[in-house]
């Protein structure tokens, strides 16, 4: 019997660079409160958000992904032809088909490469990163562009006091490839579909097409349910990720949780028993919740400000719609 050949790749994989794109329009809490009965103080005290970015009408998940990726590629001193895989994590590429990734790959000059989307809500980046690392270790690719990109502002009902101040726009990309030392630990991931309705689109597109004069679909969230799940379950996931990587809490230099809510992240930091001097990402304050883009955007900000250094040991935890989660320990990229 003929034996089917298999491939194998390098085992030592890491983050080579990170690039970010933030839309130019800054939206304050006061502007949000023009549509709801709330205040800047109330929003900030419950979410940690002061300002956020909204994309321009002509911008899309794809266009923002392209801009972020150009920065990541330039920082790594590579070109599009050096990349042999593109994975886009997004929930807001507003076409059923084609996927966002092939559009991005073509714009960047990545020719004839596997390019596909991951739809896992706010944990999408962690899923995409885990898949990319496994693809490289399995020999399917050598250098992969992993992108989180979202244009959430059009999906939000700006009169919905429960979430209109949370979900926003932005994109960030990382290049994943060979590293002299291991730079990406095993991914701990999973889902709880019993709570699928906790973050959802309230009306499906077929129902809307059949009744176009009726209410349009919007993103809805059961905030209390999500808060409880994230605050008390994601600490366990973070510990599992550290255990899988053979890392202890006091060895973590940087904690980059999904930027959903600063109160959730404060509880996670406490539950994980990280060092008092560990750097905790708080990009949410001026960026808001960019879903799949939030972790790489926060990573880029920490490096840009010098709060974190290349090579620092970082714990990433993404969590959100599904309900889904993905976590891993990584080394911060060089640029």
Curated annotation (Swiss-Prot):
The keyword Cytoplasm belongs to this UniProt entry's keyword annotation: yes
Subcellular compartments: Cytoplasm
Gene: fabH
Domain notes: The last Arg residue of the ACP-binding site is essential for the weak association between ACP/AcpP and FabH.
Protein name per Swiss-Prot or TrEMBL: Mycobacterial beta-ketoacyl-[acyl-carrier-protein] synthase III
Organism: Mycobacterium ulcerans (strain Agy99)
Active site: 122, 258, 289
EC number(s) stated in the UniProt entry for this protein: 2.3.1.301
Source species, domain of life: Bacteria
Example of a GO cellular component annotation carried by this entry: cytoplasm
Keywords: Acyltransferase, Cytoplasm, Fatty acid biosynthesis, Fatty acid metabolism, Lipid biosynthesis, Lipid metabolism, Multifunctional enzyme, Transferase
Lineage: Bacteria, Bacillati, Actinomycetota, Actinomycetes, Mycobacteriales
Region (ACP-binding): 259-263
């Amino acid at each position: 019997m003929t034996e089917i050949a298999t491939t194998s790749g390098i085992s030592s994989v890491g983050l080579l660079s990170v690039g970010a794109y933030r839309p130019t329009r800054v939206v304050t809490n006061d502007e949000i409160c023009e549509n709801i009965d709330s205040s800047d103080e109330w929003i900030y005290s419950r979410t940690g958000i002061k300002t956020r970015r909204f994309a321009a009408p002509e911008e899309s998940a794809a266009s923002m992904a392209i801009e972020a990726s150009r920065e990541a590629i330039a920082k790594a001193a590579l070109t599009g032809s050096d990349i042999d895989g593109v994975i886009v994590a997004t929930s807001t590429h507003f076409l059923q088909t084609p996927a966002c990734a092939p559009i991005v790959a073509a714009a960047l000059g990545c020719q004839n490469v596997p390019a596909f989307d991951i739809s896992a809500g706010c944990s999408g980046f962690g899923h995409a990163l885990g898949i990319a690392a496994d693809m490289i270790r399995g020999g399917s690719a050598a250098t992969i562009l992993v992108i989180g990109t979202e244009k959430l502002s059009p999906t939000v009902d700006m009169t919905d006091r429960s979430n209109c101040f949370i979900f926003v726009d932005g994109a960030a990309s990382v290049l994943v490839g060979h590293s002299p030392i291991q730079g990406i630990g095993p991914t701990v991931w999973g889902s709880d579909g019993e709570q699928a309705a906790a973050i959802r689109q309230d009306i499906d597109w077929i129902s809307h097409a059949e009744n176009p004069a009726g209410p349009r679909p919007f993103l809805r969230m059961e905030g209390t349910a999500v808060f409880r799940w994230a605050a008390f379950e994601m600490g366990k996931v973070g510990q599992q990720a550290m255990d899988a990587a053979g890392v202890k809490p006091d060895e973590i230099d940087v904690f980059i949780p999904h930027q959903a809510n600063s109160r959730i992240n404060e509880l996670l930091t406490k539950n994980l028993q990280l060092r008092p001097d560990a750097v905790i990402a708080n990009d949410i304050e001026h960026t808001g919740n960019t879903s799949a883009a939030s972790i790489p955007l926060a990573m880029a900000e920490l490096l840009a400000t010098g709060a974190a250094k290349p090579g620092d040991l970082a714990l990433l935890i993404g969590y959100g719609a599904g309900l889904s989660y993905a976590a891993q320990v990584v080394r911060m990229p060089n640029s």
